[in-house]
Amino acid sequence: KPFLAIADHLTRQGYAVFRYDDFPTAVFAKSTTYDFADGVTMILDSFAKRPDLGSLPTGLLGHSEGSLVAEIVAARDKRIDFVITLGGVAQTISDVLLYQVHAINEASGELTPEENDYAVEASKTIYDIIAKSKSPDAAAKKINKLYSYQSGTLITSKIEADVFSQNKKAEIMQMVYSPWFYTLFHHQPKKHIKKMRCPMLAVGGEKDLQVDAVTNNALFKAYLPKNPLHRFEVIPNANHLLQTCTTGSPDEYGIIEETLRGDVLEIIQEWLDSAVSH
């Protein structure tokens, strides 16, 4: 419950917090990241009608994909005075997923380095097909062709058999025909980040195996218009949920008692106090 911890902490410090965590399940199935951004805009519109909120500095805090939502809104809406990202994304989804494949496989120790390299290269081939296709049907056609070709070749290792199994193909097809996933494969964070005119705090975990904190913070720094209030932090021994961790593996998330590191809350508050005073 990291969002509860953040909301509670900031509320106690005098900040008005509105949590916008998830769409209802039935709506989410047909929604994309841009729909989530439109939802934020509707919330901002409702704030503008409230005399107790309309004149206050307004910002967005997004975790993981939520950072993409914050970037989209901040790029197009001048009402956004600051953005905070946790485990934030500046890379394309293809690059994020390739990092995940490599990092999680490496942490598990179940594959040899050569097998891990094969898994990454095979995944890259598939992700490139989706990202470069002009429609889900076009992507599905090319993926079917790829799997048909592979089924006619000699499979020489377990990793090849796993990557090109019918179960894996079914997973890929679910991604292709998911409006959310397909849209993410065609989303370019750089385009939106370059248009942001507000300060950003980007906080990532050193052992985040889902989003590479060092790489994405460097891209944020490169893409954002210059602002002395920008701040980029990598928290030592922290995972994607910014918990203190051992390996960073998603398997650890549910067994770590800590909800969110206290130093992350301190960084957020300290930066916010500075950002809203300017």
Where do the PLM segments sit?
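Catalytic histidine neighborhood in serine/cysteine hydrolases
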Residues: L224-T247
